[in-house]
Amino acid sequence: MTTAYAAAQTTEKKQSLAIIDSDVHPYMENGLATLVPYMSTAWQKRIGSGLGGGHTVASQFHLPLDYLYINSSGGMRADTARPGMSPATDPAFTAAQLLDGAGIDRAILLAGHLLGLGAMPDPQVAATIASAYNDWMCERWLQFDQRYRGGLVIAPQDPELAVKEIDRMSDRPGIVEIFMPLHEILMGEKHYYPIYEAAQRHGLPICVHPSGTENVYARAPRMAGTPTYYIEWHALLGQIHQANTASLLCHGVFERFPELKVVIAEGGIAWIAELAWKLDADWHGLRDEIPWVKRHPSDYLNENMRFTTQPFVEPPKREHLTSLMDMINAEKVLMFSSDYPHWNYNDPTNALAGLPEELQRRIMFDNPREFYGDRIN
Protein backbone atom coordinates (compact mmCIF):
# COMPACT_ATOMS: atom_id res chain seq x y z
CA MET A 1 0.00 0.00 0.00
CA THR A 2 1.42 3.39 -0.96
CA THR A 3 1.93 6.22 1.50
CA ALA A 4 -0.49 8.39 -0.46
CA TYR A 5 -3.15 5.70 -0.33
CA ALA A 6 -2.73 5.19 3.42
CA ALA A 7 -2.84 8.92 4.04
CA ALA A 8 -6.00 9.23 1.99
CA GLN A 9 -7.64 6.55 4.13
CA THR A 10 -6.99 8.47 7.33
CA THR A 11 -8.18 11.79 5.95
CA GLU A 12 -11.32 10.60 4.18
CA LYS A 13 -14.13 13.12 4.26
CA LYS A 14 -16.78 12.41 6.84
CA GLN A 15 -19.43 14.42 5.04
CA SER A 16 -21.47 13.16 2.10
CA LEU A 17 -19.84 12.83 -1.29
CA ALA A 18 -20.37 15.76 -3.61
CA ILE A 19 -19.61 14.35 -7.09
CA ILE A 20 -19.14 10.86 -8.49
CA ASP A 21 -17.60 10.87 -11.97
CA SER A 22 -18.72 7.75 -13.85
CA ASP A 23 -16.31 7.96 -16.80
CA VAL A 24 -12.61 8.77 -16.37
CA HIS A 25 -10.01 7.22 -18.68
CA PRO A 26 -6.57 6.26 -17.35
CA TYR A 27 -3.94 5.59 -19.98
CA MET A 28 -0.82 3.43 -19.89
CA GLU A 29 2.37 5.47 -20.02
CA ASN A 30 4.05 3.17 -22.56
CA GLY A 31 0.98 1.74 -24.22
CA LEU A 32 0.74 -2.03 -24.33
CA ALA A 33 4.39 -2.35 -23.27
CA THR A 34 3.29 -1.15 -19.83
CA LEU A 35 1.49 -4.45 -19.30
CA VAL A 36 4.43 -6.73 -20.15
CA PRO A 37 5.48 -7.17 -16.48
CA TYR A 38 1.95 -8.32 -15.68
CA MET A 39 2.04 -11.18 -18.21
CA SER A 40 3.61 -14.61 -17.99
CA THR A 41 6.85 -15.21 -19.86
CA ALA A 42 4.98 -17.32 -22.40
CA TRP A 43 2.51 -14.54 -23.12
CA GLN A 44 5.25 -11.92 -23.28
CA LYS A 45 6.89 -14.01 -25.98
CA ARG A 46 3.66 -14.63 -27.87
CA ILE A 47 2.57 -11.00 -27.95
CA GLY A 48 6.10 -9.69 -28.42
CA SER A 49 7.96 -8.37 -25.41
CA GLY A 50 9.50 -5.63 -27.57
CA LEU A 51 6.09 -4.19 -28.44
CA GLY A 52 7.04 -1.41 -30.77
CA GLY A 53 10.72 -2.06 -31.35
CA GLY A 54 12.09 -3.60 -34.52
CA HIS A 55 10.11 -4.79 -37.51
CA THR A 56 8.95 -8.26 -36.56
CA VAL A 57 5.27 -9.08 -36.68
CA ALA A 58 5.06 -9.38 -32.90
CA SER A 59 6.77 -6.06 -32.27
CA GLN A 60 4.19 -4.28 -34.44
CA PHE A 61 1.22 -5.74 -32.57
CA HIS A 62 -1.05 -3.05 -31.15
CA LEU A 63 -4.45 -2.63 -29.55
CA PRO A 64 -7.45 -1.99 -31.82
CA LEU A 65 -8.15 1.75 -32.02
CA ASP A 66 -9.59 4.14 -34.58
CA TYR A 67 -6.70 5.30 -36.75
CA LEU A 68 -8.87 6.36 -39.70
CA TYR A 69 -11.04 9.22 -38.45
CA ILE A 70 -9.03 12.36 -37.79
CA ASN A 71 -9.66 14.93 -35.09
CA SER A 72 -7.13 17.55 -36.14
CA SER A 73 -7.14 19.12 -32.68
CA GLY A 74 -6.39 15.78 -31.03
CA GLY A 75 -8.52 13.51 -28.92
CA MET A 76 -7.02 14.60 -25.60
CA ARG A 77 -6.85 17.86 -23.69
CA ALA A 78 -3.24 19.04 -23.83
CA ASP A 79 -3.36 20.22 -20.22
CA THR A 80 -4.10 16.74 -18.85
CA ALA A 81 -0.47 15.63 -19.11
CA ARG A 82 2.41 16.26 -16.76
CA PRO A 83 5.37 17.72 -18.74
CA GLY A 84 7.15 14.94 -20.56
CA MET A 85 4.27 12.49 -20.15
CA SER A 86 1.12 11.58 -22.05
CA PRO A 87 -2.38 12.61 -20.91
CA ALA A 88 -3.92 10.79 -17.94
CA THR A 89 -0.93 8.50 -17.38
CA ASP A 90 0.02 9.86 -13.95
CA PRO A 91 -2.47 9.13 -11.14
CA ALA A 92 -0.98 11.89 -8.98
CA PHE A 93 -1.37 14.53 -11.68
CA THR A 94 -4.90 13.37 -12.48
CA ALA A 95 -5.82 13.42 -8.80
CA ALA A 96 -4.55 16.97 -8.43
CA GLN A 97 -6.18 18.25 -11.62
CA LEU A 98 -9.47 16.35 -11.69
CA LEU A 99 -10.23 15.13 -8.19
CA ASP A 100 -8.90 18.12 -6.26
CA GLY A 101 -9.28 20.71 -8.99
CA ALA A 102 -12.82 19.84 -10.05
CA GLY A 103 -14.07 18.57 -6.71
CA ILE A 104 -14.54 14.95 -7.77
CA ASP A 105 -14.97 12.64 -4.76
CA ARG A 106 -14.99 9.36 -6.67
CA ALA A 107 -13.72 8.71 -10.19
CA ILE A 108 -14.65 5.45 -11.92
CA LEU A 109 -11.85 4.37 -14.25
CA LEU A 110 -12.60 2.96 -17.71
CA ALA A 111 -9.52 1.69 -19.55
CA GLY A 112 -8.63 4.26 -22.20
CA HIS A 113 -6.33 2.05 -24.23
CA LEU A 114 -8.69 -0.94 -24.06
CA LEU A 115 -11.90 0.63 -25.37
CA GLY A 116 -11.53 -1.37 -28.59
CA LEU A 117 -10.50 -4.68 -27.03
CA GLY A 118 -13.73 -6.32 -28.19
CA ALA A 119 -12.61 -6.02 -31.81
CA MET A 120 -9.54 -8.21 -31.28
CA PRO A 121 -9.86 -11.50 -33.23
CA ASP A 122 -8.04 -13.80 -30.77
CA PRO A 123 -10.11 -14.29 -27.58
CA GLN A 124 -7.16 -15.57 -25.54
CA VAL A 125 -4.96 -12.61 -26.44
CA ALA A 126 -7.77 -10.22 -25.56
CA ALA A 127 -8.41 -11.97 -22.23
CA THR A 128 -4.71 -11.95 -21.35
CA ILE A 129 -4.44 -8.23 -22.03
CA ALA A 130 -7.56 -7.56 -19.96
CA SER A 131 -6.17 -9.54 -17.03
CA ALA A 132 -2.80 -7.78 -17.17
CA TYR A 133 -4.50 -4.40 -17.34
CA ASN A 134 -6.63 -5.17 -14.28
CA ASP A 135 -3.57 -5.98 -12.18
CA TRP A 136 -1.81 -2.85 -13.44
CA MET A 137 -4.84 -0.64 -12.73
CA CYS A 138 -5.13 -1.93 -9.17
CA GLU A 139 -1.44 -1.37 -8.49
CA ARG A 140 -0.90 1.89 -10.37
CA TRP A 141 -4.21 3.70 -9.76
CA LEU A 142 -6.50 2.15 -7.16
CA GLN A 143 -3.77 1.79 -4.55
CA PHE A 144 -2.55 5.33 -5.13
CA ASP A 145 -5.66 7.23 -4.10
CA GLN A 146 -8.78 5.75 -2.58
CA ARG A 147 -10.96 8.19 -4.51
CA TYR A 148 -10.29 6.12 -7.63
CA ARG A 149 -12.66 3.25 -8.36
CA GLY A 150 -12.12 0.69 -11.09
CA GLY A 151 -14.04 -1.01 -13.82
CA LEU A 152 -12.48 -4.46 -14.18
CA VAL A 153 -11.99 -5.18 -17.87
CA ILE A 154 -13.17 -8.37 -19.52
CA ALA A 155 -12.80 -9.58 -23.08
CA PRO A 156 -16.32 -10.33 -24.41
CA GLN A 157 -15.16 -12.69 -27.16
CA ASP A 158 -14.99 -15.73 -24.85
CA PRO A 159 -17.60 -15.66 -22.04
CA GLU A 160 -15.90 -18.50 -20.14
CA LEU A 161 -12.64 -16.56 -19.90
CA ALA A 162 -14.57 -13.41 -19.02
CA VAL A 163 -16.31 -15.17 -16.13
CA LYS A 164 -12.97 -16.42 -14.80
CA GLU A 165 -11.66 -12.86 -14.79
CA ILE A 166 -14.77 -11.56 -13.03
CA ASP A 167 -14.39 -14.25 -10.36
CA ARG A 168 -10.68 -13.43 -9.98
CA MET A 169 -11.08 -9.67 -9.69
CA SER A 170 -14.50 -9.04 -8.17
CA ASP A 171 -13.33 -8.77 -4.56
CA ARG A 172 -10.32 -6.55 -5.22
CA PRO A 173 -10.50 -3.29 -3.25
CA GLY A 174 -11.86 -0.43 -5.33
CA ILE A 175 -13.60 -2.50 -8.02
CA VAL A 176 -17.14 -1.20 -8.58
CA GLU A 177 -18.16 -2.53 -12.00
CA ILE A 178 -17.27 -4.65 -15.01
CA PHE A 179 -16.11 -2.77 -18.07
CA MET A 180 -17.06 -4.79 -21.16
CA PRO A 181 -15.55 -3.42 -24.39
CA LEU A 182 -18.14 -3.66 -27.14
CA HIS A 183 -18.16 -6.49 -29.67
CA GLU A 184 -19.98 -7.18 -32.93
CA ILE A 185 -22.65 -9.26 -31.12
CA LEU A 186 -25.52 -7.22 -29.68
CA MET A 187 -25.85 -7.35 -25.91
CA GLY A 188 -29.18 -9.17 -25.71
CA GLU A 189 -27.83 -12.35 -27.29
CA LYS A 190 -27.27 -15.56 -25.30
CA HIS A 191 -23.54 -15.27 -25.97
CA TYR A 192 -23.33 -12.91 -22.98
CA TYR A 193 -25.54 -14.82 -20.53
CA PRO A 194 -22.64 -16.42 -18.59
CA ILE A 195 -21.15 -12.94 -18.16
CA TYR A 196 -24.46 -11.55 -16.94
CA GLU A 197 -24.87 -14.42 -14.49
CA ALA A 198 -21.43 -13.73 -13.02
CA ALA A 199 -22.08 -10.00 -12.86
CA GLN A 200 -25.37 -10.56 -11.05
CA ARG A 201 -23.79 -13.10 -8.70
CA HIS A 202 -21.08 -10.63 -7.67
CA GLY A 203 -23.38 -7.61 -7.60
CA LEU A 204 -21.31 -5.75 -10.20
CA PRO A 205 -22.88 -3.52 -12.88
CA ILE A 206 -21.70 -3.95 -16.46
CA CYS A 207 -20.54 -0.78 -18.21
CA VAL A 208 -20.23 -0.35 -21.97
CA HIS A 209 -18.69 2.56 -23.85
CA PRO A 210 -18.02 3.49 -27.50
CA SER A 211 -15.08 1.42 -28.66
CA GLY A 212 -13.30 3.79 -31.00
CA THR A 213 -13.27 0.92 -33.51
CA GLU A 214 -16.80 1.24 -34.92
CA ASN A 215 -16.88 0.34 -38.64
CA VAL A 216 -13.07 0.10 -38.69
CA TYR A 217 -12.55 -3.53 -37.59
CA ALA A 218 -14.52 -6.59 -38.68
CA ARG A 219 -15.46 -7.65 -35.14
CA ALA A 220 -16.19 -4.14 -33.90
CA PRO A 221 -19.68 -2.70 -33.38
CA ARG A 222 -21.19 -1.43 -36.62
CA MET A 223 -23.12 1.69 -37.52
CA ALA A 224 -25.72 1.92 -40.28
CA GLY A 225 -23.15 2.60 -42.96
CA THR A 226 -19.63 3.97 -42.75
CA PRO A 227 -19.25 7.70 -42.03
CA THR A 228 -16.79 9.75 -44.06
CA TYR A 229 -15.81 12.34 -41.48
CA TYR A 230 -14.85 12.30 -37.81
CA ILE A 231 -17.72 14.64 -36.99
CA GLU A 232 -20.20 12.16 -38.51
CA TRP A 233 -18.65 9.23 -36.71
CA HIS A 234 -18.59 11.06 -33.37
CA ALA A 235 -22.17 12.35 -33.65
CA LEU A 236 -23.52 8.90 -34.51
CA LEU A 237 -21.94 6.85 -31.71
CA GLY A 238 -25.34 6.73 -30.04
CA GLN A 239 -26.50 4.32 -32.77
CA ILE A 240 -24.51 1.55 -31.12
CA HIS A 241 -25.98 2.21 -27.70
CA GLN A 242 -29.53 2.39 -29.05
CA ALA A 243 -29.12 -0.98 -30.75
CA ASN A 244 -27.71 -2.59 -27.61
CA THR A 245 -30.39 -1.07 -25.38
CA ALA A 246 -33.16 -2.38 -27.64
CA SER A 247 -31.45 -5.77 -27.76
CA LEU A 248 -31.22 -6.03 -23.97
CA LEU A 249 -34.87 -5.05 -23.53
CA CYS A 250 -36.36 -7.15 -26.33
CA HIS A 251 -34.43 -10.29 -25.45
CA GLY A 252 -35.75 -10.16 -21.91
CA VAL A 253 -32.30 -10.03 -20.34
CA PHE A 254 -33.61 -8.29 -17.22
CA GLU A 255 -36.35 -10.90 -16.77
CA ARG A 256 -33.71 -13.63 -16.84
CA PHE A 257 -31.26 -11.62 -14.71
CA PRO A 258 -33.46 -9.31 -12.62
CA GLU A 259 -30.59 -8.00 -10.47
CA LEU A 260 -28.32 -7.22 -13.42
CA LYS A 261 -27.35 -3.57 -13.80
CA VAL A 262 -26.06 -1.98 -17.01
CA VAL A 263 -24.37 1.39 -17.49
CA ILE A 264 -24.46 2.96 -20.97
CA ALA A 265 -21.57 5.43 -21.13
CA GLU A 266 -20.92 8.29 -23.54
CA GLY A 267 -23.55 7.76 -26.18
CA GLY A 268 -25.92 10.68 -25.79
CA ILE A 269 -29.17 10.76 -23.85
CA ALA A 270 -31.88 12.44 -25.95
CA TRP A 271 -32.61 9.18 -27.79
CA ILE A 272 -33.60 7.42 -24.55
CA ALA A 273 -37.07 8.97 -24.58
CA GLU A 274 -37.95 8.12 -28.18
CA LEU A 275 -36.62 4.57 -27.95
CA ALA A 276 -38.52 3.90 -24.72
CA TRP A 277 -41.74 5.35 -26.14
CA LYS A 278 -41.40 3.38 -29.37
CA LEU A 279 -40.66 0.08 -27.66
CA ASP A 280 -43.54 0.53 -25.21
CA ALA A 281 -45.98 1.33 -28.01
CA ASP A 282 -44.84 -1.59 -30.18
CA TRP A 283 -44.84 -3.98 -27.22
CA HIS A 284 -48.62 -3.63 -26.91
CA GLY A 285 -49.14 -4.87 -30.46
CA LEU A 286 -46.14 -7.17 -30.88
CA ARG A 287 -45.67 -8.72 -27.44
CA ASP A 288 -46.62 -12.19 -28.74
CA GLU A 289 -43.27 -12.17 -30.55
CA ILE A 290 -41.39 -11.62 -27.29
CA PRO A 291 -43.56 -13.23 -24.56
CA TRP A 292 -40.60 -13.26 -22.17
CA VAL A 293 -40.88 -9.46 -21.88
CA LYS A 294 -43.52 -9.34 -19.14
CA ARG A 295 -43.68 -5.57 -18.62
CA HIS A 296 -43.25 -2.38 -20.59
CA PRO A 297 -39.66 -2.22 -21.88
CA SER A 298 -39.30 1.20 -20.27
CA ASP A 299 -39.89 -0.38 -16.85
CA TYR A 300 -36.74 -2.48 -17.20
CA LEU A 301 -34.83 0.49 -18.58
CA ASN A 302 -35.70 2.64 -15.58
CA GLU A 303 -34.94 -0.08 -13.06
CA ASN A 304 -31.86 -1.81 -14.47
CA MET A 305 -30.08 0.71 -16.70
CA ARG A 306 -28.24 3.98 -16.17
CA PHE A 307 -26.80 6.45 -18.68
CA THR A 308 -23.84 8.77 -18.26
CA THR A 309 -24.22 12.43 -19.13
CA GLN A 310 -21.17 13.26 -21.22
CA PRO A 311 -21.36 14.64 -23.88
CA PHE A 312 -24.21 16.54 -22.24
CA VAL A 313 -26.90 17.90 -24.55
CA GLU A 314 -26.88 21.62 -25.28
CA PRO A 315 -30.18 22.63 -26.95
CA PRO A 316 -30.33 26.21 -28.28
CA LYS A 317 -33.35 26.87 -26.08
CA ARG A 318 -32.52 26.14 -22.46
CA GLU A 319 -36.13 25.35 -21.60
CA HIS A 320 -35.93 22.35 -23.92
CA LEU A 321 -33.30 20.84 -21.62
CA THR A 322 -35.70 20.92 -18.69
CA SER A 323 -38.35 19.16 -20.77
CA LEU A 324 -35.88 16.53 -21.92
CA MET A 325 -34.79 15.78 -18.36
CA ASP A 326 -38.41 15.04 -17.51
CA MET A 327 -38.93 12.91 -20.63
CA ILE A 328 -36.01 10.60 -19.90
CA ASN A 329 -36.61 10.38 -16.14
CA ALA A 330 -33.21 11.98 -15.52
CA GLU A 331 -33.74 12.13 -11.78
CA LYS A 332 -33.35 8.36 -11.76
CA VAL A 333 -31.42 7.18 -14.83
CA LEU A 334 -28.66 9.77 -15.40
CA MET A 335 -25.21 9.71 -13.80
CA PHE A 336 -22.63 12.45 -14.21
CA SER A 337 -19.49 11.80 -16.25
CA SER A 338 -16.67 14.10 -17.34
CA ASP A 339 -14.93 11.87 -19.92
CA TYR A 340 -11.57 13.13 -18.68
CA PRO A 341 -9.06 13.57 -20.39
CA HIS A 342 -10.82 13.73 -23.76
CA TRP A 343 -11.24 16.86 -25.84
CA ASN A 344 -14.97 17.24 -25.12
CA TYR A 345 -14.57 16.93 -21.35
CA ASN A 346 -17.54 18.11 -19.29
CA ASP A 347 -16.56 20.24 -16.29
CA PRO A 348 -18.77 19.38 -13.28
CA THR A 349 -18.79 23.02 -12.21
CA ASN A 350 -20.84 24.05 -15.24
CA ALA A 351 -21.91 20.96 -17.22
CA LEU A 352 -25.33 20.81 -15.58
CA ALA A 353 -25.76 24.54 -15.04
CA GLY A 354 -29.36 25.61 -15.33
CA LEU A 355 -30.82 22.40 -13.96
CA PRO A 356 -32.59 22.53 -10.60
CA GLU A 357 -30.19 22.04 -7.71
CA GLU A 358 -31.91 18.88 -6.48
CA LEU A 359 -31.73 17.32 -9.95
CA GLN A 360 -28.04 18.19 -10.18
CA ARG A 361 -27.45 16.45 -6.86
CA ARG A 362 -29.27 13.33 -8.00
CA ILE A 363 -27.30 13.14 -11.25
CA MET A 364 -23.92 13.96 -9.71
CA PHE A 365 -24.20 11.95 -6.53
CA ASP A 366 -27.42 10.23 -5.46
CA ASN A 367 -28.02 8.19 -8.61
CA PRO A 368 -24.52 6.66 -8.85
CA ARG A 369 -24.36 6.15 -5.08
CA GLU A 370 -27.64 4.22 -5.13
CA PHE A 371 -26.71 2.29 -8.29
CA TYR A 372 -23.20 1.21 -7.22
CA GLY A 373 -24.07 0.70 -3.56
CA ASP A 374 -21.50 0.18 -0.84
CA ARG A 375 -18.63 -0.42 -3.27
CA ILE A 376 -18.56 3.27 -4.19
CA ASN A 377 -18.10 4.39 -0.55
Where does each model-flagged region fall?
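Helix-coil boundary/capping segments in enzymes
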Residues: 1-377
